[in-house]
Amino acid sequence: MTILTVQSSFSSSRVPVIKNANFDQIPSWVSLKSSTSSPSVKISHKQGQVENLHLVSLSKHRKLNEAFEFLQEMDKAGVSVSSYSYQCLFEACRELRSLSHGRLLHDRMRMGIENPSVLLQNCVLQMYCECRSLEDADKLFDEMSELNAVSRTTMISAYAEQGILDKAVGLFSGMLASGDKPPSSMYTTLLKSLVNPRALDFGRQIHAHVIRAGLCSNTSIETGIVNMYVKCGWLVGAKRVFDQMAVKKPVACTGLMVGYTQAGRARDALKLFVDLVTEGVEWDSFVFSVVLKACASLEELNLGKQIHACVAKLGLESEVSVGTPLVDFYIKCSSFESACRAFQEIREPNDVSWSAIISGYCQMSQFEEAVKTFKSLRSKNASILNSFTYTSIFQACSVLADCNIGGQVHADAIKRSLIGSQYGESALITMYSKCGCLDDANEVFESMDNPDIVAWTAFISGHAYYGNASEALRLFEKMVSCGMKPNSVTFIAVLTACSHAGLVEQGKHCLDTMLRKYNVAPTIDHYDCMIDIYARSGLLDEALKFMKNMPFEPDAMSWKCFLSGCWTHKNLELGEIAGEELRQLDPEDTAGYVLPFNLYTWAGKWEEAAEMMKLMNERMLKKELSCSWIQEKGKIHRFIVGDKHHPQTQEIYEKLKEFDGFMEGDMFQCNMTERREQLLDHSERLAIAFGLISVHGNAPAPIKVFKNLRACPDCHEFAKHVSLVTGHEIVIRDSRRFHHFKEGKCSCNDYW
């Protein structure tokens, strides 16, 4: 009996380990043959049968590293490699898309087999096409002395997939002209390769040949034609063929429904589903996933729940292919509790499932839960995380202003090569910008080879949010000079920068040139930004005139921006008008009550102020609770108004009382509308006081405080005063921008 003895595992020092399909650092075949290191495998015979069986086994298990090393040992032992072994090896190279290995193997095959069969050469051809190396495939195709339907189908499909349609059509026409009758399987393969609108004409030609060949009754080909027309964007043709099908297979149904959904016709997809249910068409799990996506795009919660009931009845909700779309559906319908329940039913959640639930936490503003889930999953099964998951965590960290965790996640993503696309890098820029780490944001941006418009816009927005208006405008000009065309969101960022710096003329110029110079039509959002610029600058009459003359009816945000300016500049008359308009357009927005209340109390109109509070109570509205937080030694400390739950509460209030003697000085005057005791309880003051008692060293880092709402004027003055008295730099990020307090001054110059 032949025995194969394996002494030890193969040494990774001899042949680089293949870790993924993108591996390209592969030694030449000559270096493999000339290796002088001691063999790790000893072969006890030269008959070759067992050796080839072992080689086939390694190939089928996709262990190319070990297979190549074993080939070296077979060479040393004088054992030849069979054609079947080569076929299996090329199949492994094809599936792993390892072009470098495939080329080495092809060179070796040429040396070892004088006249390879057409079957073996087709394996090589398929490998080159799958690895998207048409140059190698073309060369081999021309060299082949014998061609069959598989050879031609492989090349035609490869040309079609890569958009080289003239060659695909030419080869297909030549095959027909030669009298060869294509097998039905060839049509199915060709139809799968036509995946974009440019291939539609070629697809119609194939459809015509199918009709001439009398293959219209072939269900697989009919399904292929339906899906081909969907992928090429001709839904009318797809529906026409679908309606003529005698037997409507689920694959054809789902293909058409996917086409409808992707084309923004989700309601047509649902109608098709309902019609086919009535006809008694059988369904599989993929059909349900497509229907749920259509329901999600329309936010059809009730219909989606009915689909869920069908899924549960069939026992499919534990399957990841159905459970994940269910989770996504409920999240998009803002039914997060149902999404969590659906997630818990999935037997083995995959990376898409986890990404969906973490993204759901972010959409529901449960950012801490998103980070907590990510950390837990990372420690248990890091391999299940994908680039979308990391992008969601970057978003969560940007809202939480947690630069420490954000930096750790960033490092982990780099280590695992999961930063992903430029979208992920743009999310990083936003995260670092909103955490107040512009140097890190700049480093990410500068590391990008060709930043797209999303990255440019994120970087400009970061500087606008930070209060660096001049830098934001400089970046905009640089972006344009690089040939990048700004989009609607880019102009929002530029106008925001102008607003935060009181740059009225620059804002007007930006709005005027949007359409004229850059062919970007301004929307109501851009006009609202301009209203904000006027209002912040105290140009309330100009703002009102602008609102009357703009091509849109003022919306709730228009009046909210105007009302905010009225409060900042204490214009009660215009503030009353703005408040009334805002309450009419959006009666649920508390700003329409709180800002007029502040104006009335400032003016001493107590009855009118009480009326505002009465309206809020009648409509069961509550002002959003102010919350501020600060990081110390990696831990986040949160404070709300009047907070007394912090372990260091006594020290915090004692620190605040140290400034009590200055509260009646010339620099800091409390508004008449609030008592001094109430001001002491404001969340940002509590956070600042905690920061002061936590600082260490002679040159401590700035005290960074983050707040969910706009900083109140009194606390803004308080922070300026503290920075002067203590010498500490204080940074506050509120809902609008960053404030840098140093030596009694703020970077915003009171534009906020």
From Swiss-Prot:
It comes from the Eukaryota. Keywords: Chloroplast, Plastid, Repeat, Transit peptide. This is Pentatricopeptide repeat-containing protein At5g13270, chloroplastic. Pfam families: DYW_deaminase (PF14432), E_motif (PF20431), Eplus_motif (PF20430), PPR (PF01535), PPR_2 (PF13041). It is found in: Plastid, Chloroplast. Residues 634-664 are annotated as: Type E(+) motif. Transmembrane segments: none annotated. Signal peptide: none annotated. Residues 1-80 form a transit peptide. One of its GO terms (cellular component) is chloroplast. GO terms for biological process: RNA modification. Its main location: plastid. PPR repeats lie at residues 47-81, 82-116, 117-147, 148-182, 183-217, 218-248, 249-283, 284-318, 319-349, 350-384, 386-420, 421-451, 452-486, 487-522, 523-553. Residues 665-752 are annotated as: Type DYW motif. GO terms for molecular function: mRNA binding; zinc ion binding. The lineage of its organism: Eukaryota, Viridiplantae, Streptophyta, Embryophyta, Tracheophyta. Belongs to the PPR family. PCMP-H subfamily. Residues 558-633 are annotated as: Type E motif.
